[in-house]
A protein has these predicted regions:
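Conserved alpha-helix/loop element of class I SAM-dependent methyltransferases that forms part
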Residues: 3-18
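Conserved Rossmann-like nucleotide-cofactor binding loop
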Residues: 28, 53, 122
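Conserved SAM-binding loop of SAM-dependent methyltransferases across substrates and taxa
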Residues: 29-41
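S-adenosyl-L-methionine
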Residues: 48-89
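C-terminal substrate-binding/active-site "lid" region of AdoMet-derived donor-dependent transferases
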Residues: 103-165
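Short beta-strand element of Class I
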Residues: 42-46
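Active-site segment flanking the S-adenosylmethionine/decSAM binding pocket
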Residues: 72-115
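Conserved class I S-adenosyl-L-methionine
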Residues: 19-28
């Protein structure tokens, strides 16, 4: 599950206030899809996930939070999706990162937003190099590291979480 702070940053970078369709690649149990659906009830969300256990939990979460605007697509991206998107979130690449970036750029409307999160430095490097190779301008890259207050004996300390890399970029053009 995408942690709350990472999810908030990713959703902000997706600029969903101007979107009508979001694709969530590697949706997992649906934390990003559910949060987006709750914040933007008019948004259509395509959640792609390959893991059967995660798909079951994703469907349970969709029902629990009454998010009828989430369509669940079992399988592996890239896949055929008829409708282009205004925003794509990639929370996992399954080892096909450059293929997924290429597919995302084809699947996005002009001026559409792509946001990706990584925990591995190698995936960050591959993504940045590939976006540069594609000529994508204005790539925004952040490292987010959040610490949470925890108890230690009779005292408290901030327990660090692992850092997460967030890349946000925009497809060239203007969406009408």
């Amino acid at each position: 599950m995408t942690k709350e702070a990472v999810r908030a940053l990713a959703l902000s970078k997706l600029e969903l206030h101007r979107a009508s369709h979001l694709i969530d690649i590697g949706a997992g149990t649906g934390s990003v899809s559910i949060e987006a659906a709750l914040q933007y009830p008019g948004l259509r969300i395509t959640a792609i996930e390959r893991n059967p256990d995660a798909l079951r939990l994703l469907d349970e979460n969709r029902q629990h939070f009454a998010c009828a605007n989430i369509g669940i697509f079992p399988g592996i991206a890239p896949m055929t999706i008829a409708e282009k998107a205004d925003a794509i979130f990639m929370g996992g690449s399954g080892g096909h990162l450059t293929d997924l970036i290429d597919w995302s750029m084809r699947q996005l409307h002009p001026a559409g937003r792509l946001v990706m999160t990584f925990i591995l430095q190698e995936n960050l490097n591959i993504a940045l190099a590939h976006l540069d190779h594609l000529g994508i301008q204005g790539v925004d890259c952040l490292q987010l590291q959040v610490s949470s207050l925890a108890t230690l004996g009779s005292g408290h300390y901030f327990k660090p979480n692992n850092p997460v890399f967030v890349i946000a970029c925009q497809k060239e053009g203007t969406h009408v």
